[in-house]
A protein has these predicted regions:
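Non-catalytic, usually N-terminal nucleic-acid engagement modules in DNA/RNA processing proteins
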Residues: 1-55
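Catalytic cores of enzyme domains
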Residues: 42-208
Length: 208
């Protein structure tokens, strides 16, 4: 993206454009679940799977792949996302999409030399959402659904969430996914499947 600090490309080519690659719902889950990364027992299997794909594409197109797990310092994926899609902040500290709700994620970005500088003006313009999603939501059920009130609307109480997951009463969240996230009425058709949701919840609990 124009004006962003992007890494140098192979052979001294100019970094012209940044492509974001991600998932909607559980569209990528089957491919990941069947990969050796999911079964090898090593840490961070989804990050390693994403890196294998991103790095392969970077080699194919002569670009450089960037990942959310590269930091610190972290790449500004959320800022990039808001410039590419009509995303908005939500009370759950996640970006909400008007169609997909909270059920989307960026797996990597590809810095590419494929476009000429004159083609960048349209890509650099921020995407403006049509209307506020969460402020128009009746009652904001996401803020009431968490059993330990980990979300205040202004902050995420990580310690309270993690402690709950390590208790017997937290097993519903482990098995079905975050109750606050599932309470959001936007994008319900894209909710993560049970195995996908449990994978992320176990990964979170394992690091806290």
């Amino acid at each position: 993206m124009a004006g962003d600090a992007l890494p140098a490309l192979p052979d001294g080519q100019r970094a012209a454009v940044l492509w974001l690659a991600g998932q909607v719902g559980s569209a990528c889950w089957a491919a990941f679940a069947e990969s050796p990364f999911h079964r090898d027992g090593l840490p961070d299997p989804m990050d390693r799977w994403s890196k294998s794909i991103g790095d392969a594409l970077a080699r194919q197109f002569g670009g450089v792949a960037l990942f959310p797990s590269d930091g610190p310092p972290d790449h500004p994926f959320q800022d990039w996302g808001r410039r590419c899609e009509p995303l908005q902040a939500s009370p759950l500290m996640l970006q909400i999409h008007p169609e997909f709700g909270l059920w989307h994620a960026y797996r990597f970005a590809l810095v590419s030399p494929l476009l000429e500088p004159g083609d960048l003006s349209a890509l650099a313009a921020p995407v403006v959402p049509d209307a506020e999603i969460c402020s128009r939501c009746d009652g904001q059920p996401c803020l009431r659904a968490c059993p330990v009130q980990a979300f205040t609307g202004d902050a995420y109480r990580v310690e309270a969430c993690a402690a709950h997951l390590h208790q017997p009463q937290g097993q519903e969240c482990i098995g079905k996914g975050c109750q606050a996230r599932r309470a959001c009425p936007v994008g319900v058709d894209y909710r993560y499947g049970p195995e996908h949701a449990a994978f992320h919840m176990r990964a979170f609990a394992g690091k806290h």
